[in-house]
Amino acid sequence: MPKMKTKKAAAKRFKATGTGKLKRGKAFRSHILTKKSTKTKRNLRKGGYVSETQEKTMKTLLPYL
């Protein structure tokens, strides 16, 4: 059976932690920032984690991560 391919678009956006969770960046921070409050922009700087409901999908996209 051939090797499974990693989806490179996903590999660039997610990093695995030591416990196996997936870290991700937050969306809505690239442009149209004038109407967003300072507090909102500050909170968007922090990373997030992939939810448990999405982890199974992510494992198929990133089989070797």
From Swiss-Prot:
Give the keywords, sorted: Ribonucleoprotein, Ribosomal protein
According to the record, the segments passing through the membrane are: none
**Looking at the record's lineage, which domain of life comes first?**
Bacteria
A single GO cellular-component term from the record reads: cytosolic large ribosomal subunit
One Gene Ontology term of the molecular function aspect:
structural constituent of ribosome
Q: Does the keyword Hydrolase apply?
A: no
Is Ribosomal protein one of the keywords UniProt gives this record? yes
Any one Gene Ontology biological process term? translation
Kindly list any coiled-coil regions of this protein: none
Protein family: Belongs to the bacterial ribosomal protein bL35 family.
Q: Which NCBIfam families match?
A: rpmI_bact
**Name by which UniProt lists this protein:** Large ribosomal subunit protein bL35
Report the gene name: rpmI
